[in-house]
Swiss-Prot record:
Cited PANTHER family: CUPINCIN (PTHR31189:SF13), OS03G0336100 PROTEIN-RELATED (PTHR31189)
Leader sequence residues: 1-27
Biased composition (Basic and acidic residues): 67-84
GO biological process, one term: protein homotrimerization
Lineage: Eukaryota, Viridiplantae, Streptophyta, Embryophyta, Tracheophyta
Naturally occurring in which organism (per UniProt): Juglans regia
This protein's name: Vicilin Jug r 6.0101
Amino acid sequence: MAFKPKIPIALLLLTSLLAICAGLALAMQDPELKQCKHQCRHQRQFDEQEKEHCQRSCDEYHIEKKARERAERRRSEEGSSREEGYEEEELGGEREEENPYVFEDEDFETRVRTDEGRIQVLEKFTKRSKLLRGIENFRVAILEANPQTFISPAHFDAELVVFVAKGRATITTVREEKRENFNVEQGDIMRIPAGTPVYLINRDENEKLYIVKILRPVSVPGHFEAFHGSGGEDPESFYRAFSWEVLEAALKTRRDQLEKLFGKQTQGVIIKASKEQIRSMSKHEETTPRIWPFGGDSTHPFNLFHKRPSQSNQFGRLFETDPKECKQLQDLDLMVSFANITKGSMAGPYYNSRATKISVVIEGEGYFEMACPHLSSSGSRGQREGSGSSRRRSRSGPSYQQIRGRLRPGMVFVAPAGHPVAVIASRNKNLQVLCFDVNAQGNIRFPLAGKNNIVNEFEKEAKELAFNFPAREVEKIFRNQDQEFFFPGPSRQPEEGGRAFE
């Protein structure tokens, strides 16, 4: 009797549901996502796992739809006229409607997705704007993994720095025929050299693992890939790219056995592991002292939160790696910092002399404001839903546009060198921001407010000439604030689209 495959009714229902939602897209915007999830939750034929999978599919469809809309909008804008002029030509004629310094969910590509987690990679910075070409060869990626999961081995054609934002993991690397296991936790930073085989587990039984990575490609500028040796069909093993004759000779194994080995794995990059497997892989941590970053050539992780904060008061705390101490980050010209801004408070304004700051929002909400001299005054820059607004004033000499962006968990924003910036937490919750400073060597942070602000260092005559205002009054204003770096935030936070940022 011929075999007839049976398609589960739950799969048919899910396919039909997504098709219905795709039809609704013509008439609806965000409400379609809400409707899709509502339908998922009320499907009686679905068990809880199928309902969760259905809702994740809704999210994925919604993100892909937003990305398509953005791509279509960009294509239509390419045909629009651009202002002539040397400066604008040199900067790539920046006339996009989007705020070029803020990145949201739809700006991430999902490279890995399984039932147990996902890996997202932020688009290349210069895809958004040539203004960001100074950080073109850096990429940001985010790993999320469910409790007690295994992330399969891979190596990357990029230098890799990881920061454990949430959870507990065991990271295993193989170098020079030596395996090293490192139990890491929230606040740990670890450098993984290009080409190093690495795999990890989420060893926590309850908490999700959330790791933020910054990568500097070493092969193709601005592009990187993960190479999976261990695997089969999903993840695909790079061994499968070789002929069977070469594999038989190299591994000294018959083809039929090789076909079984490299065709077995179909579960994906992030898979569930048993408690026994997790326990076994997490108990072998190396006992070599963690001497990094205070000299030596160790590859051990270093916990940022075990250092004393470089700035601390009731309005926030700032933890920073010192480029002079962190020898492993020196050749990358990179510094890592973490700001915890108390709810209702703010950091800055300040600017960096050399470093461009790439910031990832970990927890909380708020917004940032930045002064930018590069953007066109025509149009309304940054009028992106949920992101920002902008303003530019015409003056004799340099003119600065206000860049403002709303901040939520998972968002990325960039403050280029020399650009004055302030970050404000909502009044409801602390705002936690992870920062990677590119071009960190020799960088100086110049405060524009607080007891050590740069104006206080000006000579009396310089103050009068610069502001066309009595020096005494200038000093009174700039010496009013006796705190440093972190300050009380605005008493009234701005609104966007009729709703307050908080």
